[in-house]
Amino acid sequence: MFGGGGGMNPRKMKQMMEQMGIDMEDIDAQEVIIRTPDEELVFDDAEVQLMEAQGQKTYQVVGEPESRELGSGEGSAAAEGDSDESDSSSGVDEDDVELVAMRAGVDEDTAREALEANDGDLADAVDELE
């Protein structure tokens, strides 16, 4: 992007980036976790940089990750908690039930029934109850 840049003065490089509207910032991260469908990549003491250009933020993580299967380690409690979010008999998310109940001013059982009747569509459930 900057034509080699191998011998470029870091101060000059920073000045050029500022002129182009690119802002970089180091983030003091203790741990970075990237969760994929199959595993977690855990970076301890990773170097993290935030680069903001044209209103878009990009995070760069540098370090050696430790790979662990989902469901092991610290993240497993959060992952198991997510599975309890939906009611096993209806498949309706509890957060959705609470939101519909609050918006429509009804109890959670009524909100759950409305969500089930509307295939989980929040707007239709609220409209039906109002």
From Swiss-Prot:
Q: Give the Gene Ontology MF terms in alphabetical order.
A: RNA binding
CDD domains from the UniProt entry:
UBA_AeNAC
List where Acidic residues composition bias occurs: 81-98, 116-130
Task: Name the segments for region: Disordered.
Answer: 54-130
User: Which Pfam family, just one, is annotated for this protein?
Assistant: UBA_4
Note whether Zinc occurs among the keywords.
no
Q: Where is the NAC-A/B domain?
A: 7-74
Protein transport in keyword set:
yes
Alphabetized UniProt keyword annotations: Protein transport, RNA-binding, Transport
Where does the record place Basic and acidic residues bias? 105-115
**GO process annotations (BP):** protein transport
**Highest taxon above the source species:** Archaea
Which HAMAP family does this one have? Answer: NAC_arch
Q: Which family does it belong to?
A: Belongs to the NAC-alpha family.
Q: What does this protein do?
A: Contacts the emerging nascent chain on the ribosome.
How does this chain assemble? Answer: Homodimer. Interacts with the ribosome. Binds ribosomal RNA.
Protein name as it appears in the record: Nascent polypeptide-associated complex protein
Naturally occurring in which organism (per UniProt) = Haloarcula marismortui (strain ATCC 43049 / DSM 3752 / JCM 8966 / VKM B-1809) (Halobacterium marismortui)
